[in-house]
Regions:
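Sec-dependent signal peptide recognition
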Residues: 2-10
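Hydrophobic h-region of N-terminal signal peptides that target proteins for export
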Residues: 11-19, 37
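Metal-dependent amide/peptide-bond hydrolase catalytic core
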Residues: 21-25, 71, 248-435
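Acidic/His- and Gly-rich active-site-bordering loop/insert found
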Residues: 22-133, 143-161
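Divalent metal-coordination and catalytic microenvironments
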Residues: 48, 87, 100, 138, ...
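Hydrophobic beta-strand positions in extracellular immunoglobulin-like domains
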Residues: 89, 230-232, 298
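Histidine/acidic-residue-rich, glycine-tolerant segments that coordinate divalent metal ions
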Residues: 121-133, 139-140, 151-152, 157-278, ...
């Protein structure tokens, strides 16, 4: 596309070597292909960043991806989970099947900053006109996986196995009542008649550029949505005794819910977060309303505690409401299950990445409470998910804008680290003499 062609020259001038150069180099042929694709990878990323698309609206993104995969002579399926793309690369020799996944959707965020390729896109979200931005780094995920496909396709005759490239829509969340991208792709038989023995994914994270973070076991939280309706009895604001005040009840419920993680669950063995992010009630300053609506999110790391957590939340909400004379209805909807990296597979993955980047560029870490629907792929296939750092040199995690922030920033040379990590885990499985 024209925008990609224009950006290639600029990207070629600005791409700098990642700080994590290979400790144990890839074969000369692989290394040559890596160096060749780096300017294109940056150009793809800038193109996607300038043209972000919301969940299940990734029409342009998926078209660019599919055209590129076809140019590599991969088997390509489009329209998987509406806008998803799947490419299959068959090596020259038989061997295992693995899958690599990247998510494609952007967020309803208006970008701030002065990047020459910053997003000016707008769209509709929840009935509102919104800015659209790749504020979570998915533009880099897509570009890195396209680059990985390019390198691996150049080595197809030396590969012993098959690689499935999964470009997933709607990681950030489906419309109410719908399925997110990972679950929908699985429901639509994303792998066809292939049976991958492992799947890998990564995510841009505000940590040191040139490093990756590998977390064994629970890595990211499960995420559920909570909807609460508190019903009282409407009355004049000057006569609260004549009714039941659902606003006061909702305030007490919000406070009481904070005892669930701190007093009702094991804070060490079963860390939990309960956040109420929306409260809506009343239409006039001197009327106590009939109802109050609340919405929030629940986060947890231990799948075994989920039902107990639900029970404690429902009990806390309904009994706190009852103490004020009000009633409360609670609905909890699953958004994502915890992302859990199998220790044995993580150990193999970490070793492969350390050989490629150097041990000092591979970090361990603690679980984090954001969620990621890659976990549903892990239910179907053993899988590993890891972070790659995108902070510019000298910028700490505390100083960097977090994911979902209008100033979220990716230090582009970090993408080479991500590419090398993905190639390392792939060639460890299907590389034969190319690993």
């Amino acid at each position: 596309m024209k925008i990609v062609a224009k950006l290639l020259v600029a990207a070629a001038l600005l791409v700098a070597p990642a700080s994590a150069q290979t400790a144990a180099p890839f074969s000369a042929s692989v290394e040559s292909s890596i160096q060749s694709v780096l300017p294109r990878m940056i150009a793809w990323r800038r193109d996607f960043h300038e043209h972000p698309e919301l969940s299940y609206e990734e029409v342009r993104t998926s078209r660019v991806v599919a055209q590129h995969l076809r140019s590599l002579r991969l088997e390509v399926r489009t329209g998987v989970a509406q806008t998803g793309v799947v490419g299959v690369l068959r090596g020259g020799r038989p061997g295992p099947v693995i899958a690599l996944r990247a998510d494609m959707d952007a967020l309803p965020v208006t970008e701030e900053g002065d990047l020459p390729f910053r997003s000016r896109a707008r769209g509709r979200y929840n009935g509102q006109d919104v800015g659209i931005m790749h504020a979570c780094g998915h533009d880099t995920h897509v570009a890195v996986l396209m680059a990985a496909a390019t390198v691996l396709a150049s080595q197809r005759h030396n590969l012993a196995g098959t690689v499935i490239f999964v470009f997933q829509p709607s990681e950030e969340g489906a419309p109410p009542g719908g399925l997110g991208g990972a679950r929908r792709m699985l429901a639509e038989n994303v792998f066809g008649d292939l049976h991958p023995e492992a799947i890998y994914g990564l995510h841009a994270w505000p940590q040191t550029s040139g490093t990756v973070t590998m977390i064994s076991g629970p890595m990211m939280a499960g995420s559920d949505r909570i909807d609460i309706t508190v019903t009282g009895s409407q009355t004049h604001g000057a006569q609260p005794h004549a009714g039941i005040d659902p606003i006061v009840a909702s305030a007490q419920i919000i406070n009481a819910l904070q005892t669930v993680p701190s007093r009702q669950m094991d804070a060490v063995g079963s860390p939990v977060i309960v956040t109420i992010g929306m409260v809506q009630g009343g239409v006039r300053y001197n009327i106590i309303p009939q109802t109050v609506q609340m919405q929030g999110t629940i986060r947890y790391l231990n799948p075994d505690t989920r039902e107990r957590l639900y029970e404690r939340i429902r009990r806390t909400v309904t009994e706190t409401a009852a103490a004020t004379g009000a009633t409360a209805e609670v609905t909890i909807t699953e958004n994502a299950i915890p992302t859990v990296n199998p220790p044995a597979l993580m150990a193999r993955t970490r070793a492969a990445v350390a050989r490629a980047l150097g041990e000092d560029h591979v970090n361990s870490g603690l679980p984090v409470m954001p969620a990621e629907d890659f976990a549903y792929f892990q239910q179907a296939v053993p899988g590993v998910f890891f972070f790659y750092g995108v902070n510019p040199p000298g910028v700490t995690q505390a100083e960097a804008a977090p994911n979902h922030n209008p100033r979220f920033f990716v230090h582009e040379p970090a993408m080479e680290t991500a590419l090398r990590a993905m190639l390392a885990v792939t060639l460890d499985r299907v590389g034969g003499e190319q690993r």
